[in-house]
Amino acid sequence: MRAIIIGIGQCGTKIADIFSLVDFEALAINTSKSDLEYLKHIPPERRILVGESIVGGKGVNANPLLGREAMKRDLPMVMKKISSLVGYEDVDIFFLTFGFGGGTGAGGTPVLAEALKEEYPDSLVVAIGALPLKEEGIRPTINAAITIDKLSRIVDSIIAIDNNKLKESDEDISQAYEKINYAIVERIASLLALIDVPGEQTLDASDLKFVLRAMGSFATVGYAKADATKIKSLSRLIIRSFENEGLYLDVNLESALYGLVAIHGPPEVLKAKEIFDALSELSQRIRGKQIFRGFYPDPREREVEVVTLLSGIYESKSIENIVITAKRYAREFMKAKEEGEMKKRELLKGLPDFEDIYPGEVDEG
């Protein structure tokens, strides 16, 4: 299976850079020249500066209108770079990594996603976006809600990561984001690494594409890992991967249409009964009842790793909170703006024009 990672904006390019570290094909697109130069693993020829004619390589200051315009203006250059990377080999999935709350990512990702859908109709386009932390305030929240709306009409699935679930209470934002970025890559990379790999029961690219072809609905990746010698119940470990503690998005599990579970570990631990008991519970709990599964016994492994992908999700508390909060902020802002305009008009009402005060002072002939 072939996947290409395209990072957009500061958050997205940092995530793509980590994917590049673990040998994925990756591109970085940003409006900030310094942010592109900061990357460590994506080769310079795969770093694309957009919007230089608008912001001079200095970023868009979390303004998605500028981010959108930057991507639109330089879209031919971007698509040419992508075409060069794609070459003559088919791409199964384009993963677009970005931050929902930023400017370049929130504004530019829908533009690029639409172009990719048109140029590569046989490839899936999947958005992987990090939701803003509560501490980040109003603007990122509004950016996120609007971007969710736009992307849901374009991409095949939106894998949303709720940063608020991952941030520890004593961490500052920069520490939290670094940990979150690595965690995102760990989960996605662990899943993709098992696609088309021989196993007791194998997941192939068509299985993954079926699960992610979900009409712009939400998806989430669950994860659980443990030392094989310390596992008392394999079923419990698998179940943990698709319960709230294992998921990076607060979702109503019962609303999911599809599930995909990959289990990797030493063969003596991968007991069939425990695996099927856990998968039976998952199939009973999700609405669609369709579970794809892969089992990968490996005598070299000392840990058991479980990756779960749930898609076709339309009910998520994390998403609802973002959208409801954004609507409230927007209403309050529009009300304050209207009240300010009214007060200004009331204050200035009745003032004369210059001609009323200085009649005949200027010879108009």
Swiss-Prot record:
Q: Which Gene Ontology BP terms does the record give?
A: cell division; microtubule-based process; regulation of cell shape
* Keywords tagged on the record: Cell shape, Cytoplasm, GTP-binding, Nucleotide-binding
Residues annotated as binding GTP:
10-14, 103-105, 136, 163, 181
GO cellular component terms listed in the entry, alphabetical order: cell division site; cytoplasm; microtubule
Q: Which residues cross the membrane?
A: none
User: Belongs to which family?
Assistant: Belongs to the CetZ family.
- Return the protein name: Tubulin-like protein CetZ
Its source organism is: Pyrococcus horikoshii (strain ATCC 700860 / DSM 12428 / JCM 9974 / NBRC 100139 / OT-3)
Organism taxonomic ancestry: Archaea, Methanobacteriati, Methanobacteriota, Thermococci, Thermococcales
